[in-house]
Amino acid sequence: MNKKSNKSIYLVQSVQRAVLLLEALANKEAELRIAELSRKTNLNQSTVYRLLGTLRNLNCVEQNPDTHKYRLTLKLFELGSSVINKFNIVQRAIPHMEALSRKYNEAVNLAKLDKDEIVYIHKIESYTTLKLDLKLGSRHPAYCTGLGKVLLAYLEEDELDSYLKRIKLKRFTPNTIVDKEELKKELIMIKQKGYSFDSEEYVQGVCCLAASVRDYNNKVCASLSIAIPSIRLKDNNIPLMIRNIIATTNKISCQRKR
């Protein structure tokens, strides 16, 4: 029996549908009615009602007594936090991220690559006017972000080729690279230089400098970036900033096992 058939045999429909509801509730709307959830998940309202009843009993969702809409509970936050806490790299990174953020008074972010996207696992907010809607656990494209490009650059060649075949390069700004050959050339350059630069490729007006973080086996396991408003980029000594970012990721990276 092949892996594909095994995967379909063990897919439990009720669990799959419950996760669809949780994902719908996790989107930007804080609360949703049963009819809204039905529309977003393509599940009929009676199914949504039954699943919500189970999720309420498990303390994963609750109903607002005033609006009668449903929302997620802190139970999901507890579960998510426990996953992040298992990443030893986050605990190692926090003091160094805080120091880098204080040095430049800019936002500093830490991310991992997961299923063709980057996932934010920690961030230090900027006290300046730059406020990006980057929630912990949120997913973003890898190919047009500084964090993502540095992670893609260190993939094995067959993994990168497979990624480029799967992914569709969507244009977010005039600077987004949407040619796969051009992107591959840039990723080769990133690996050679040891850092990546996102020049308003994902969000207009925002640039990012990023470098890789390594685990105990000296494999790239995460990436760290400074997000800077483009208007302030010229005020910084970019080569020095790059050196400081790389120095920070070297401090965070675990020492190779002997």
Regions found by a protein language model. Give the residues of each.
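Short, structured helix-loop boundary elements
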Residues: 11-15, 34, 69, 73, ...
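Cysteine/selenocysteine-centered motifs that mediate thiol-based redox chemistry or coordinate metal-sulfur cofactors
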Residues: 162, 168, 249-258
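A structural microfeature
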Residues: 59, 120-122, 222
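Extended hydrophobic
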Residues: 176-249
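Short, solvent-exposed recognition segments
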Residues: 130-202
